[in-house]
Every structure is written in C-alpha cells, then in structure tokens.
Amino acid sequence: MRYRLTVPARINLLGNPGDANEGDFATLSAALEVRAGALVEPAEGLTLEMIRRDDSGLPPLRLEFRPGAHPLPYDGQLDLLKGAVNRLYQHSAEFRDKFTRRGARLATWTDVPRQSGLGGSSLFVLLALAGLRAFYDLDSGAHNDYVLAELAQRVEAVELGITCGFADRYVPLFGGVAYLDYRDKLQQRDLGTEPFVTYERLDNWVADLPLVVVSSGVARDSGDVHARMRPRYLQEHEAWQVRGGEPPPMARFMAGAWQTAWRGKIALLAGDWPAVGALMNENHRLVNEMMTYCGFADGAGWANNLFIETALANGALGAKLTGAGGGGSAFALVHPGDEGRIVAAWQRVAAEAGLTKAHIFRPGIARRGLVVEVE
C-alpha cells in the first residue's frame, strides 16, 4: 500500500514565543491551509526524497540507504527526515523490528515558503514520523499524535541541535484554531517526564479569521533567533528564582506575551476583533523590544516591521510576526472585506523596498491537521 499525507503550516496569533522557548506559557495559534506533503510506499531499502515544487531551480534530492540502516548520518542533506527516522528508531521497539524487515520510500514536498516563519521545517519531521507510523502500522496508542509532536521537538532540539519550542510540532498535527498551554515544559525534559501540551480547539466558535500573510523573502533561521534569546531567558529566570525580587527583563517581556494569549482567547471567543488586534500589536511591541534587548539591531527585523507598520497605516486592526523574527513572515488582522487594501499596500512597499521574493496571500484556516490517505 501507498500512503499520501499532508500537514498545514501554522501561525502564532498571540503569545509567542512562550511555547517553551522563552518561557512555558501559552499561545493562541492557528493552522493555515498551506501544506506540505509526503508519499510513503514500499522500497528495497530506505529511500528519502525531496521533490521540488517551487521555482528555485534546485534539483530534486534523493538518498538511498541499505535496509535497516541506523543511525543515518547528518551531513546537511535531508537531515530533518534522517532525524525523524533516527529518533523513532531510538524511541520505538516496534519500529526497530519492522524497519529491519521492510523497506520504504519517503518522498516529501512543500508549498510553504522556505524560512518563512510558518513552521515549515517541522512539517518534514512530522510527515516522516506520521508517514512511518502509517506505513509500518505502528501501534496508534503508543505512537499517538501527542507522542509524534513531542518526538518531532526532540528531533530538532536533540538530534539536530536546533533551539525550538512546541507550537510548530503540535499545530500542524491537530489543526484548527487553538489555545496551547505549555506549563512545566520550559526545561524540555525527556519524553514522559513532563506534561504534553494542552491543545484546546476553539474553531467551533470561530468561523474564520480575516487574515492576510506576507512572507518577506528575507532568509532567516528561527533556531538562530531562539539560540540567542532562550539562553538569555533561562539565565535570567534561574537567577531570579534564586534571588527573588523584581522579575528580570526577559521574564517581564514573556509574562506580557502570555497575557496577550489568554486575553486574546477571551476576545476571540467573543468575536471582538478590535481587541484581538490590539493584543496582537502589544505582543509585537514586546517581541520587538525583547529582540532589541537580546542584541538584534533591527528588533523583529526591518522587513517584518515595514510590513507591520504598513498594515496598521492602512487600517489593519493588528499586525505582528507569525513566529520568530529576523526574516520570516508577518500577518495582519483586518476588517472583513479589507483584505485587498492590505494586499495592495504590501505589494507597493515590497516593490519600493526591493523585496522581490515577498509572497502575499490570504490563508484559510486548516480545520484538519494531519491528513492520511491510503491508496
């Protein structure tokens, strides 16, 4: 049998980066109907592939390994897929047994802009884990979606040394609009020694989100951003726990970000778009100041701030980063029907600023997260 899978991108509406990166607080997040996918089918050994669907001009990438090969070496080629195989092999005795007896071809693709702040790198890890679970018919209780999300975080953080939290690993699997609670996950301990994320779906009460998203085309690595900010947070937080007194700057920034998340949940359920927009603006102000405090000369990134300021000047209710700053993406919450005005304004400033790779789109909410089809 062959299995086709897709998972959606994500944005953090409010609360970022409190997903156990800089603080274990909460985010209000949404899955977007922009997807990455995979095909898993029988093969002689293990074949990993990246199918190019963009205009980058880069050739497809294909790697082949002998049956049951472990560990797969990290060399900069398809390391996210290799990391998923290695981590699942380490975690699951059932997978180890079946993997040695049956080969698989795992081919992946994506429509999510590269380094766009939409959780794109994590999608490959999730597709690999979910694809292998389906192909090898692994126990669905022992390998449930919460476990896969947690394994995906360890693939990036432990296997590959990428500083990351948990939103990018949960939202694509579970989908919808949700309030995510990350309490007691700051230290990112071993699987089973800390809580799973609490994933509270809200889209039964939220018909749609009037959003416009822009990927700036400015390359950045979210791991590089958090690699500077997370150690600063942990250092200040640990010292504060010992000495007491007034909270240090990083703790104040993130306590404020958490307030935008829980207050945003209340406003979102009430359909109070102006209040949600105001909280988005406050969240972005905090992140911009925090990044400046952590040594990023242009705060959340000059291109991001340009698009955010332009959106607000053209009537958006709120605008902020989708995830980590530097490059990546920004998004705006608008009055329903005003999407075209923001798109036109962004197209104009992108042309003026020479951001020729900027990609602007109006996303729908992906109410289904992981989709698996059997052929």
Residue ranges with predicted function:
Residues 324-325:
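Long, low-complexity C-terminal extensions of enzymes
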Residues 110-116, 317:
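Short pre-catalytic strand/loop immediately N-terminal to key active-site residues, enriched for Gly-Thr
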Residues 1-14, 18-19, 32, 36-96, ...:
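C-terminal nucleotide
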Residues 25-26, 38:
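Catalytic-core region of right-hand nucleic acid polymerases
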Residues 117-139:
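DPxDG-like acidic metal-binding loop motif
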Residues 22-23, 30:
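Phosphoinositide-binding peripheral membrane targeting modules
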Residues 106-109, 146-153:
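Short, conserved phosphate-binding/catalytic loop or strand-edge motifs used
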